[in-house]
């Protein structure tokens, strides 16, 4: 029996997207500005999307590669990333309003995101549109989507309860106001909504403030936000972490919300595995990470990209700084194989090495 030819997982993904026959492919990733941007975050939220978007463009497709930065979230960081005193003072405050933890930048978000932005060119990331959730919440499309969720809150509560198992109270309003006084966006509560004037009446347990805010000043419950972003941004492809992939889990609940509440089809998805350090998943807020902007100081950017592309998205990857020389050697070997200097006995392994080397070099070795 003739063996099937090797097809790289990036190309398999592209072929699936081509079969959808959409006018424009909107390839989306998300980045939580909760702490340092580590290399683990970029596996499934940046490099996977970049490879797929690039190949689609090469095939003549209209493509938009997006990266959503979650700036409308509350501060959740904990020691050792921050001091207990800093955590006590700022926990629950919208991260855009949290000061720089080192006093060197304008705010928390800039402190962690600017180093990431500065090295994108070195990693060959081109044609990337970066948008923040704060900007999205100001848009007319998002405000209308918030109003839809408020109007259909009973149905939304039923869907969330079906998947999450949590019961929301009868007076639940799926909108978390941003307190204009202390910038709390974690424990505030909307107690009434005026849809005509697009305002929510709120109470803030953190500082005791009460009043009204516009629907552009706050955020949705995160599962509703996820589905809302699909709708507002017209997302057609979006990978997601394996923690969301379990049957009946968070992505399934968002799919149901998209279809049953918003009346849209969810984007094609792809689960990916985290990157680990010493058996623990890399975590910005928990301080277990290797910063993305540090990588070009110790190895070629293509080395990291090759590691991610030669491995299938759900492959468990264990990282240590001591592993960098090995990863560099593997990339150098792939280069020799690609240019015919070295041979590999197993055809599929050789084909994977060659194709992954191409992708790591933006299809232009």
Go through each PLM region and give its residues.
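Catalytic adenosine-cofactor/nucleotide-binding cores of aminoacyl-tRNA synthetases and other
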Residues: 246, 251, 273-365
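A glycine-rich helix N-cap at a beta->alpha junction
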Residues: 86-124
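Well-ordered, non-membrane alpha-helical segments in soluble/globular domains
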Residues: 45-50, 106-114, 247-253
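Active-site cores that bind ATP or allylic diphosphates and position pyrophosphate for catalysis
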Residues: 126-293
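Flexible loop/turn segments at secondary-structure boundaries
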Residues: 33-36, 72-76, 137-139, 275-281, ...
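Charged, often glycine-rich, active-site loop that binds/positions anionic groups
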Residues: 72-90, 145-146, 281
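Residue-level signal for inorganic ion chemistry
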Residues: 38, 149, 300
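N-terminal catalytic cores of NTP/NDP-binding nucleotidyl/phosphoryl-transfer enzymes
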Residues: 1-83, 227-248
